[in-house]
């Protein structure tokens, strides 16, 4: 039995198995939407859960405006990642073709404007997109020099889906989020 268990573990290390963060079914996290209005911006966010053809998903839309030093809308969830054997995040998404972002905050991103981010582009069709942790870059700006260039996967405390950085109408759906 020990030999068999060893072979199973050896042939299927944890890094090859996905871990669901949110599937809108039996695994859920609490998403909180907000915009740059928390810092004086004028971007507007609408966020709600929808269902279409039997598939439940989160929907975020709104006008992103860079006026008043703004430029983002997002929905973010507190998470606790305790296993560093994963290579990245996988998101089931569709949208209006704009470039969107995943922002990760860690134990070291103590100031609200610090994060590690990576972009992805949507289409109008559902797709799973893999975003490797190696593609996440630390944010620039005030006090970002105190952040390590790479983040500690075990230190992840929140994940945000973000429309950011330019004037545009954001429209994105998310039906799943996993570690891979």
Identify the role of each PLM range.
Residues 15-180:
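Beta-rich carbohydrate-recognition modules and glycan-binding surfaces
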Residues 1-6:
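Sec-dependent signal peptide recognition
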Residues 7-15:
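Hydrophobic h-region of N-terminal signal peptides that target proteins for export
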């Amino acid at each position: 039995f020990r030999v068999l268990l060893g072979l199973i573990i050896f042939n299927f290390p944890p890094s090859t198995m996905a871990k669901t963060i949110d599937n809108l079914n039996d695994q859920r996290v609490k998403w909180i939407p907000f915009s740059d209005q928390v810092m004086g911006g004028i971007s507007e966010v609408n966020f709600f859960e929808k269902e279409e053809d039997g598939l439940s998903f989160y929907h975020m839309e709104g006008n992103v405006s860079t006026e008043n030093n703004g430029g983002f809308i997002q929905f973010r969830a507190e998470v606790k990642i305790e296993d560093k054997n994963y290579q990245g995040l996988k998101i089931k998404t569709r949208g209006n073709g704009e470039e969107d972002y995943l922002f990760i905050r860690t134990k070291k991103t103590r100031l609200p404007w610090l994060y590690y981010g990576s972009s992805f582009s949507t289409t109008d069709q559902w797709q799973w997109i893999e975003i490797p942790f190696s593609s996440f870059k630390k944010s620039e700006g005030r006090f970002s020099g105190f952040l390590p260039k790479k983040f500690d996967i075990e230190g992840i405390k929140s994940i945000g889906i973000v429309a950011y950085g330019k004037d545009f109408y954001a429209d994105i759906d998310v039906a799943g989020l996993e570690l891979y």
